[in-house]
Amino acid sequence: MKFSVFGLSTKQTVGLLVGVIGLLIPPIFLSLPGLSFAGHITLGIFLMAAIFWMTEPIPIYATSMSVIFLQVLLLSAQGPVYQDAELPVTSIDHIENETWQIPPEALTEHESVWIVRDDETKHIEDLRDIQKENDIARISSPSIQEDDSVITDPWHRKVDYEPTSYEQFFGTLANPIIILFLGGFMLAAGAVKYKLDRNLTRYLLKPFGTRPLYIVLGLMLVTAVLSAFMSNTATTAMMMTVILPIIAQLETGDRFKIGLALSIPFAANIGGILTPIGTPPNAIVLAAIQDTGRQVSFTDWMMYTTPVVVIMLLAAWWILLKVFKPSIENFNLNMKGEFLTSPKAIILYFIFGITVLLWITENQHGVSSNMVAFFPIAGLIATGVLDKDDIRTLPWEVLWLVAGGISLGLSMDQTGLAMWMISGINWAALGAFALVFTFGLISIGLSNFLSNTVTATLVMPLGISLWSAGVLPEPFGLITIGLVISVSCSLAMILPISTPPNAIAMSTGILRTPDMAKGGLIIGIIGLIIVIANALIYWPLLLN
């Protein structure tokens, strides 16, 4: 039976209802041991966001904005929930030795207490000899001190959570990683406007001749390189227009058309792994790592990911040629085209080149890639290379999507939700191989059905919590698990909905879902093996 509300499909309607229920149940109806009230609120927001991102009753970027709105409303110090909240505390009476007298309502259902010491809340669990008499309770504990106060309502909304200013949540919209992405988007817009992308592509394809296997390799290399510094979505859209004249030379029903069409999104997804700005999961992982105080420069990231990208590109090239064999010996390629020489085009070339050079040499000059990204933002506008109409066409919704992901990860960490979610799993018993395999498989699996940005948002806080808990000792630590998550998210290529490049390629009408699934599944399996090998061998060597 089909049903819908507000013009939504059945799937979207169910997603809307289940998402709202997921938002309300944890803070209103649940009392999960070890999770603060703020953690319950965040769990509700997490469930709503995950369900909305999966079923899309509203656009995925709108879900991200809803996340920030709910955080400001329900978790900020200025919101109605915490604006006037004060912890109910009372003094602790010292009886003798390590014996204390407290109100009985201060005891939790698990016979522990929350105390306030130096304006911080602490959970005391080592209670002994608990005796309840009328309106008092006697307890023994070596962890309680003379000046401590006890919280008389263990379920109070401020227990184990100190609300932060709403500015912290709004600030994610201007997070340095967002600025980094905005700079990349503006460079991409300039490249398209002044035909730098198409002319550069034609120029770079010349060395590959006219044989099909080398043309495919050339297309994939050019796509991967552009995708490393531009949006992989924009790169795919541009490169699909480049290959259409090539595909037109093939006869109807020729399966090599499928291989050519798949080579672009697959190369874009793989190329995006190379740099921090290549794809949103990289930005989310990098932001999460930097928030812990660890630094990974632009060059560092490329050192980690270059072997993965090179091996994956060669593997994808070989797979596509084997599965969709060429039926033509040579292509007739039109390589005509000149670089524009107008003053604004020359300014674009200069800004593009300097920006990429500064990004690559970050370790040498010490200027953050986030700061460098503001050079094209200011330079392209100030010189008139991009005008207000160009700015309006930028993919702002992607920035909003990433900002919501960063903000959700912030609350999952601050409220203890991320740590609570993994506390019941003995991750330490899994071993290095099992940890890498589990995180990689989860990231690839989720990214095939959710956006890879959403997947990185959901999985990365778990990796940080494991690192914080000491389960990921160096050199197999935070950076390694972050790389596993970000790289694995980009290996999801089975379905048209898995990534925007896949969807763009599907829109040409050349591909069918089974064709994409066949190639994507093989590449995903090989990619996971490559990720595991790098995580266990290559990355630890670099980190050492």
Predicted regions and their residues:
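Juxtamembrane and boundary regions of transmembrane helices in multi-pass small-molecule transporters
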Residues: M1-L30, G34, L187, K193, ...
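Membrane-embedded alpha-helical segments and adjacent helix-loop junctions characteristic
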Residues: F3-S4, S31, A62, S66, ...
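Interfacial loop-to-helix junctions that mark the boundaries of transmembrane helices
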Residues: F6-T10, L32-H40, F52-P57, P163-P176, ...
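Hydrophobic alpha-helical transmembrane segments
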Residues: T13, L17, T42-L43, Y61-M65, ...
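Generic alpha-helical transmembrane segments of integral inner-membrane proteins
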Residues: L17, I21, L47-I51, F69, ...
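Flexible hinge motifs at transmembrane-helix junctions and intramembrane kinks/re-entrant loops
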Residues: P33-S36, M48-S66, V72-G79, F169, ...
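Structural signature of hydrophobic alpha-helical transmembrane segments
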Residues: G34-L43, L173-M186, N232-T236, T306-M312, ...
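Transmembrane alpha-helix interface/packing and boundary motifs in multi-pass membrane proteins
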Residues: I51-I58, A189, V222-N232, P265-I277, ...
